[in-house]
């Protein structure tokens, strides 16, 4: 009888759509966070008064914790039971509702407890399953302990419904219980049992909340991509083949470039530390993922051009347009999450970067169709990327704080130099009304036909020498190398131009440090 009831419940849950299941996950998580704030020790809506830190806590830190654990369990169950990840998600989205019981139980027992990550691991691991030992003093409430065991039992029941195997059900019970317990103590484990030292205030990620957020966002990002791969391998393989790593590296690297220059300009010494390195990674990922999201968004409107040029557009290989659009939105949302962890001004800078990228691609505005304007837009995006790195120490003044010796030559040089990116798309752009400078000026068949664009690209390096005379040697070398390559190569490679940009950027950074202040 019980087996039939469980089977019927599982079949009913599997009948819902995946979209609705994910919406349930969203609802349960935020309902739990809301109730926890009101009924646990805080007795306050939102845990604290309105602030940047409280926003991170409510909308990033806690949701990322629950979402990461949810997808981790779904991935484990799906892999071990060889059940489709989508089906497991649908059932798990109903069972996740158990998490709202935690504050209800705690409130009924003692009017709420202060829930934190376990302050010490020994009592947490040794006594978690011992009902006679309280763990409230290390931040673990009775409600948490009861519900974690209950959720593990639900997983065991689901396993039995799918396999009719008591031993596998028992194994999944203990495995899921262990995973949840270890996950709950993950930050204390990473801090070598002394979270008060590792998560102390200071550094690029200044508050403990920012540090917690970046850890769980990195974990969530990894699990989200793994989950999507399990949902639809064909889709993810097609999408990953379109990665433009050289451009993602370029934009992410610009944030690091800006951060490095701001250190020199501000007179701050970089402090070596794991969370400072994670802060640098956070800057990089915010722009790298942001660019990837915009690239996917641009693919939605470049199908005709890509068909002619032979570029790898997943929409030409059967990927559904709606799924591709959602993937673009997901990447942009992840990018914004990384940016807001750096600081609030960084999120506004990235928001402007994304909006600019949307206007660049979206008809009827589609700024990429207009000569000069298209590369001016890219130049502004480059400046925003540098400003994001500046925002760590300059906050809302980041753009105004950019030295004119960087701002002006970058605006001019990128406007001219990025004409090279369109050399390989001339036929497709011409056929679809996208008028770029290469469409107007570049003729690959002759030396004289390649000269105008070769000259523009090489001059872009020399512009820096006009504003910063100390870099004239490097500017001449890089400009000459790019000129010769563009003149004598009929089929140019975009990678060459980006490698030259990376090398010149490193050279420019070195020279700016030597001649500081700017």
What are these regions (language model features)?
Residues 2-518:
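Multi-pass alpha-helical membrane architecture of UbiA-family
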